[in-house]
């Protein structure tokens, strides 16, 4: 038994499922999860001391790589001044100014402690500002675990929301409408059915929780137009894509202006953090300037602000995003080339520092229903093969992969050579 396996057995005695977030349990791929002891650059190291080239990056925040010296130094310096004050700090102001400077649609921003808090608060604000109850989300998009957001569509059909987790009253879920991602007709149909009841659309501009699905041309622009036509707010959830797809997020990359934006992951440099911001007239509706209540004991935590500011400063380096995109393209297209070489059907998507691969004969994956038809057994086999080769991918066929600036030529080469060997073994076995 490895030390990771032993720790997992020990953890299950005191922690539900042995983990503090479900995907970490490896239920999507089978086997026992790795327990991580440390990380540096492009590598993570498990409890047995084995190194892995990491394409999870703490689920997105580690865009510069693990344990980056500038971030580490900023955190250590901040710790000497205290861990939390429960009062305003100059660091919060600096972070707000940095976010506003990088994302033109954000005129004011409120810091929180997680992505779930950010999306939950943005939706409450949208409901309060519009005085409407219903929200519109998309099948397969994840926006955190707030009650109103854990809702799915039935068989891809347009539907009044049904809870997708016990513990969510149907009275909550009925206000959540679910449309089909990358299908404007499904959105217009809901607006025509509820023309004065929908407060907002919330969307992942690149869906990263059904693997990696970019928007088709015109989709985000169409959502903007529909919101304008029916008086709803457009919330772009950039918790995952913010400052990962481009310096101004996915909204900058695709040229779409939302009313509100949610952020997380990258802006914390690896620390727990979230934020929501947007039009000043909307943001002024939040307490203490407005009637919509939102608060948080650790919001704007000085350690998180210090880490985030250090990372955000580094992201302004000229040519960084072009280099990151080139690395991502090489990995995604390298996986596809290896799969083609061995006659294993695969489709790929990638944008900025995010990528996804799908074991399927479908050529272009643009919707959630296509993702659910992919070969999960092939994914599991590939996943464990890569893990044995020292490459750590997201342990779920429904999660995106992430590159960092720490992934160099050697890491990319080793990863693609490993993929070639694993796919060759898969072909031989079949």
Curated annotation (Swiss-Prot):
Gene Ontology BP terms: protoporphyrinogen IX biosynthetic process
Catalytic activity: (S)-4-amino-5-oxopentanoate = 5-aminolevulinate
Main location (coarse class): cytoplasm
Keyword Aminoacyl-tRNA synthetase: no
Superkingdom, taxonomy of origin: Bacteria
Cofactor: pyridoxal 5'-phosphate
Its EC number(s): 5.4.3.8
N6-(pyridoxal phosphate)lysine: residues bearing it: 265
Record pathway: Porphyrin-containing compound metabolism; protoporphyrin-IX biosynthesis; 5-aminolevulinate from L-glutamyl-tRNA(Glu): step 2/2
Gene Ontology terms, MF aspect: glutamate-1-semialdehyde 2,1-aminomutase activity; pyridoxal phosphate binding; transaminase activity
Quaternary state and interactors: Homodimer.
Family: Belongs to the class-III pyridoxal-phosphate-dependent aminotransferase family. HemL subfamily.
Record NCBIfam families: hemL, PRK00062.1
Name of the protein: Glutamate-1-semialdehyde 2,1-aminomutase
